[in-house]
Amino acid sequence: MARQPHILHLNWSASNAELLRNGARNDCTAVGNQNSNDLFRFTRGRFLSDESRHLSKRYVQFEIDELARLAVRAAETASQGSRRCVNTEKLPDGMHNKVVRFTMDDGSQIVGKVPNPNAGKANFTTASEVATMDFLRNVMKIPIPNVLAWSSTSENELWDKLEVNVKFKVLRNIAFYQEAWLHTTFSHYGSLYYKNDVGLSTPSVEYTDKAGVTIVDDRFTIGPSVSRQNTDDGRLEMDFDRGPWTTAADYERATGLREIYCTENMPKLPRSPIALHYSGTYQPSRESKILAIESYLKLLRYLLPEVSIQTSHIWHCDLHAENIFVNPSNLSEIYGIIDWQSTELAPLYDHPIEPYILEYDGPPLDGLLDRPKLADIRSLFQGDPEPLAERKATSLYTKMSLVSLYRHLVHKKMPLLFKALEFRETLCFQLLLFTRNLLVDGEATYLALLADQQQNNWKDIPKLNHTDEKFPLVFSAEMLRQIERDHIGATSSMELMREIQEMIGPKYFYARGVVTHDEYNEVSQIIPRAKKEFIRKYARDEGEIAELESAWPFD
C-alpha cells in the first residue's frame, strides 16, 4: 500500500511507436542516469534456480527516447508547463514489466510500463490491460487512476503500520468495489479489448448491470484470455484455445485441454518448483499427467458449483499492498487500484475473493464465520519468552480478526459472493484449481485425491454422491496401488525440497525464488555446501550421485 504521488501512468506498445514515427514532436531531452543495458534487463535481484532462463524471459529492448517523447506528450495533456524531459530513471523491476520514471521540466513525473516477454502475447497484453482500465474507470466508475507509482520497501510497510480500525475501513472500501464487480456480469469468458484492436467484426461486449439491464457497448469486445495461467511455464509459446467461451463449463474444459496439449507437445516438461524428483522418489511422466487431466475432464460436470456463481465477472486478482493507493490525508480512503495486466473475465467462484492483503502465516479459522479466540492463540506461543509471546499472539489475533471481520461483512452485504467463498473451501473447487498447473506438478497428488474419493463413494463430490448414474471414472485395483506408490514418492519429493530449503535457509525463499543482490552473495556461498551435504546424505551409489547432481534445483 502506498500514498499516492502526482504522476501519470503510461503504457508502451507497438502502436505508440507507430504514432511517434508518424509525426510526434521530437522535443524531449532524456537524461539517462544509468547503463542503458540495465534498462532492458532484470536488475531487481537474482534468481536461485534456472537464472539464465528467468533473465531471458525478462529482457526486453525498447526505444527509451521514443518512450520519453510519448511521456512528454502525456505530460503536456495533463499540465500546461511540461515541455521537456529532464531525467529518466528505471524503477525496480516487476516480475512481468519494466518501469521507467520520466521527470519533466516542471517537476511532474510520468511512469512508463513496458511488458517483458513473459507478460503474455505481445499483441494482446497491453491492448487488453488498457481496455480493461478504460472500462473499469469510465463504465463501472472504479478508481483506476491515471497514476502509477512503484512502491519502495518502506512504502509497502504502510499496511502493517495502520491501526486496526483503519485497516478494516480499507477492507470495507475494497468490499464496496467488489460489490460493483459482483453486480456486473458478462455474456462471455475471456478478456476485454477495444474492438479495433482485435477486429471490428467481433461482437460488441454485452454485460448486465446492477439493475439487471443488459447493455451492449460497441467500443469493447471480449477476446482471448490474457490470464497468467495461459502464459506461464512455457504455455505462452503453445497454440491452444484461449477463448472467449460462452459457459463456465467451456472455460474449465479449455483448462484441461490446454494442459493436455502442452503436456503432449512441449519438448521438455517444466521442472517442479516444489519437489525434487529422482529415481529414489517419484519421477513425473507425460502419461501420468495426461491420466490426471483426462480424469478431470471426465469428472468436470460433477465438479461445477450451482449456476448462480458460474457467471462471468471482471475482478482484481492481486489485491496486495503494492496495488492499492490511499489518500495521504485519510489513509482509509482508496485513491486507486492498479495493475490490471492479465485481467480475465472468469466465473465468480474462480476469482480470489479474499484480498491478498489479508494473507498471513498462521492457523486457519475453523469455519468461515468463526471468530478467533485470543486464549487459543496465546497457547501457540507458550514456549516463547515474554513479552515476545504476547506480541506474537496479539499480532496473529489481529490478523485473524481482520479475516473474520471481512468474511462477516461479505456474508452480510454480498451473500452470493459468500456462497462463492464457501465453494472455494470444497474439494470440488480444489480439483478444478489443481488442474490448472498439472503441466508443472501435482498429478500424483491429484490422482491420489480421486482414488480416495472412489474408495469412499465420492463422498466429497455431491453430484456424484447423490446420483444413480454410472460413475464416469473407475480405477482398477492395480491402478489404485500404482497411484498410492506414486503419491508416497511424490510426497517424499516435496519433503526433500523442503529439506533443501531448510539447509540453505528459509529466508531466501520468501519471494518466488528471487533474492536481493546482497542475499545472493550470501546464499551463493551456502548453496554449494548444502548441495554437497545433501548428496552425501541421500546418494547410495555413483549413479544416484549423478542423478542428484542433475536434479539439484539451485544454481
Where are these regions (language model features)?
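C-terminal subdomain of alpha/beta-hydrolase-fold enzymes, centered on the catalytic histidine
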Residues: 320, 332, 341, 441, ...
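Conserved NTP-binding catalytic cores of kinases and kinase-like/nucleotidyltransferase enzymes
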Residues: 2-156, 163, 176-179, 187, ...
